[in-house]
């Protein structure tokens, strides 16, 4: 935080920087002609690939922010680094950033786990603000999905899709 800025100015500046980083990452991806490398993974797509329908609630635990790689339903609103990809997320993002900077306790995010990857169900803005401020872990309520085991070659893992 810059000491001479009031909190509202700081929050506005944080969001502006986060959006600028997201736009720069998108431009660089286009220049490198990467195929959708800057998008979050869609949980529905990955779940379908793995035929993972068996869900088991695992409780609340601490999860590494870097392990959160995708979203349930909002994968277009944030980029691969959970930077805000759309200006429309700004008001909520700023509200979460303000609470973070005040040291307010925020509720756990809700995540789905598939193999070693996590997908946000609820808490996209909290994950985004945490990533922006280099917070290493978040408290999360986790439900785990297990893929059906089929004969034949295994589908690509969610983690392997990250490397693509």
Give the role of each language-model region:
Residues 1-117, 121, 125-128, 132:
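Short, charged/polar connector segments at secondary-structure boundaries
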Residues 110-117, 121-164:
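Glycine- and acidic-residue-rich phosphate-binding/metal-coordinating active-site segment common to enzymes
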């Amino acid at each position: 935080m810059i000491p001479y800025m009031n909190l509202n100015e700081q929050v506005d500046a944080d969001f502006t920087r986060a959006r600028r980083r997201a736009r720069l990452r998108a431009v660089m991806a286009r220049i490198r002609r990467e195929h959708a490398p800057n998008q979050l993974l869609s949980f529905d797509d990955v779940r379908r690939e793995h035929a993972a329908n068996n869900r088991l609630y695992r409780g609340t635990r601490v999860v590494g922010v870097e392990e959160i790689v995708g979203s349930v339903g909002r994968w277009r609103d944030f980029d691969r680094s959970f930077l805000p990809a759309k200006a429309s997320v700004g008001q909520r993002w700023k509200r979460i950033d303000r609470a973070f900077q005040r040291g307010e306790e925020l509720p756990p995010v809700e995540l789905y786990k598939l193999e070693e990857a996590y997908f946000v169900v609820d808490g996209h803005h909290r994950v985004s603000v945490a990533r922006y401020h280099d917070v290493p872990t978040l408290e999360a309520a986790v439900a785990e999905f297990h893929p059906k085991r089929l004969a034949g070659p295994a589908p690509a893992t969610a983690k392997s899709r990250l490397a693509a």
